[in-house]
């Protein structure tokens, strides 16, 4: 299978997830950054908005985003209203809490939105690949990998 990655989705806008999104944007690739809706805000994208804004100023230096205009490569959204954004992505990188049950819930939620040949990756440091792939359809299992970006991603 030949696969050319043109657009990436990163799910999880914490320090590592937003850092991965910045790394991708720094390479002039389009990236979608998604996270949950903040419970304490009327803005459904508060978490990802804050993460994107902080990419210019995180410490230690250098900040994750090399140049301010690279932020234009990042589209933000949330996991309630913006799942359709996943349909455009060739690679989906999950960077959420290290709890198997929560990861499985997320995978089940996003599977209907995956492109037929999209690669799905978990940026885990503790969970085995076979456990992550449990109960996934066979056509997804064959495209599921583990990535491991260190903190901070650069």
UniProtKB/Swiss-Prot annotation:
This is Putative uncharacterized protein RC0842. Pfam families: 3HCDH_N. GO terms for molecular function: NAD+ binding; oxidoreductase activity. InterPro entries: 3-OHacyl-CoA_DH_NAD-bd (IPR006176), NAD(P)-bd_dom_sf (IPR036291). One of its GO terms (biological process) is fatty acid metabolic process.
């Amino acid at each position: 299978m030949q696969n050319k990655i043109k657009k990436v989705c990163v799910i999880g806008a914490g320090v590592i997830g937003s850092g991965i999104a910045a790394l991708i944007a720094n390479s002039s690739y389009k990236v979608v950054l998604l996270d949950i809706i903040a419970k304490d805000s009327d803005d459904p994208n508060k978490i990802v908005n804050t993460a994107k804004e902080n990419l210019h100023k995180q410490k230690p230096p250098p900040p994750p985003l090399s140049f301010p205009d690279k932020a234009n490569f990042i589209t933000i959204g949330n996991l309630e209203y913006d799942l359709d954004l996943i349909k455009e992505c060739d690679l989906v990188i999950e960077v959420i809490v290290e709890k198997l049950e929560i990861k499985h819930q997320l995978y089940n939620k996003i599977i209907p939105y995956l492109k037929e040949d999209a690669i799905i990756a978990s940026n885990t440091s503790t969970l085995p690949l076979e456990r992550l792939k449990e109960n996934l359809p066979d056509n997804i299992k064959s495209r599921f990998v583990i990535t491991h970006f260190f903190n901070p991603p650069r």
